[in-house]
Amino acid sequence: MEPPVALALFITLITAAGSVYALDYVSVADSSAILYDAPSLKAKKIFVVNRYLPLEQVVSLDDWVKVRDSSGSISWIEKHALSSKRFVEVISPLVAVHEEAEADAPVVFNTRQQVALEWLETSDDGWVKVRHPDGITGYVKAKEVWGE
């Protein structure tokens, strides 16, 4: 194999392998949606979930998406029930949302576990910028939320 061809093949393989491990988060778009144990309406219904719940997309088929939730549970959901809009789920019992990405910054609001907040961006220093459904924005530590 010619060196340029081998290099091109190597770069293609490395790029493809990297994309396999990239996390792809989606959220529930409908007011509620059903999680199933298989990609079929005839499958066992596992759970009903609410709008904005973040889910990690594991596999996508034509009409179904295999997803993982914050507890690590795997299930299937109809693709039309999902949105690409990003949300995070609060996983700590009580979380202070700060005005700036600093622990000593003023707190703009507090929120509880299992609340969904719109994801705006993640910083390199471990903070996530979020928006509450009421429109208030602030920063939380990345370790206190899931789905970022």
What are these model-derived regions, one by one?
Residues 6-17:
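Bacterial N-terminal signal peptides
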Residues 1-2:
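N-terminal secretory signal peptides that target proteins for export/translocation
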Residues 41:
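Extracytoplasmic Gram-positive cell-surface binding/anchoring modules and repeats
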Residues 19-37, 45-51, 58-99, 106-116, ...:
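SH3-family beta-barrel domains
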